[in-house]
Amino acid sequence: MDLLGKKVLVAGCGKSGLGAAGLLQKAGAVPVLFDENEKLDGKALCAREDYPKDTALVLGSLPKELLSELSLAVLSPGISIEEAFVSTLEEADIPVWGEIELAWNYEKGKVLAITGTNGKTTTTTLVGEILKRYQDNTFVVGNIGTPYTQEVLKTDKDSVTVAEISSFQLETAVHFHPTVSAILNITPDHLNRHHTMENYAAVKESITKNQTKDDFCVLNHEDSWLKAFAPKCPAQVIWFSSKEKLERGYYLVGSKICRNLGNGEEVLLDVDEMQLIGVHNFENVMAAIAIAAAYGVPMETILDTVKHFQAVEHRIEYVATKNGVVYYNDSKGTNPDAAIQAIRAMKWPTVLIGGGYDKQNTYDEWIEAFDGKVKLLVLIGQTREKIAECAKKHGMENIVLADSFEEAMDICVRAACPGDAVLLSPACASWGMFPNYEVRGKMFKEYVNSLKG
């Protein structure tokens, strides 16, 4: 869509919204920032360095006269398409996009796009590192931290963009067309937004909707949702599996990552050569290898990068050993399935901090995965009573409810003995206690690093 000189509403005044407005302004459109929160400090917002100069700001409700002037509306990922003002826009026949669709409108190169409930950040970061070693004009964007809108005007016909894409971002993607897509897994999450697993799965699968048989889609062979989806996938499917030797795809045999693409089995590397730990990370690595290889990166470059790649911040991140106790930060474990992977990676009796914002998930499988490994469960946040009841139902008795994060940390330090681990892996979002999981993880690390020993 040609937006030169057109007025575009950008809903949401966070990092994504400001990035979208900045892109529109640079591209010659006229952005108008909008937020329903009429109590937002507009003066402070407009004073931010990343606030697009001279951009109009509307707080509260949408003026009717503005509606008639708009050519497009762009929603930030945190804004649901079910919001009342979105219906107002649609009734006025104003197209509604998200930031991913807006960026795609200006994309000149190829895109490798990664989604899934868990593993997105690690996989995207690893693919980004591989591609950066392969070619200079590589951009790593999306849900990972740098908005796609911030980088897209730097792309050209030879560039590649590696994008981490969330379900919230896919909801408002219309023409987005990655050359290689990947869906790492689909497990319960964000059901407070998507309502049903069927809806959630459909949104994740929509990353492929504009792909063709000339494109590739990397899928997890162990995921029942993805097995059911594969026959409908418009792209060429490349499987990976941590449990089964595949006739075609990437798979784990003992400690060896192998592939067979129709020309016989090839051993690629031993997981002991990697810095990452845990089966979930072996899956992430297989997906990353498959994505990069499908794009055309030589295997030697891929494997050398994999061997030197370290865990991303806040995802089963080793922090320190204090007085014989190891501390791990898994603040990015914001749902039960992600937190299960962290528990499985622990090799020690574990004091676990869990709980946070309630996304309407269930916690039975998470509690069952403790398998006697969790010696004490310290619970915080909105879900603490809900999780405590679930844990008691499964026969767990060593449970403490803390009133604050600091109190939870104090309890953990007192309870942990030499040879134990203290793990922050909440299985819940951070909202309510923290602005995001990064702040939660940083607070954990600051506390640990302040300990003597």
For each of these PLM feature ranges, what is it?
Residues 14, 37, 144, 222-223, ...:
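Residues in the short beta-alpha loop(s) of Rossmann-like NAD(P)-binding domains
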Residues 35, 60-61, 97-101, 141, ...:
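Beta-strand->loop->alpha-helix junctions that form or flank phosphate-binding loops
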Residues 12, 24, 73, 114, ...:
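Residue-level signal for inorganic ion chemistry
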Residues 43-55, 364-420:
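C-terminal helical cap/extension that packs against the catalytic core
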Residues 2-7, 17-27, 271-374:
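Nucleotide phosphate-binding/pyrophosphate-handling subdomain across enzymes
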Residues 22-26, 64-68, 77-221, 225-234, ...:
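Phosphate-binding loop of NTP-binding sites
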Residues 32-37, 217-221, 353-354, 373-382:
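Short internal beta-strands
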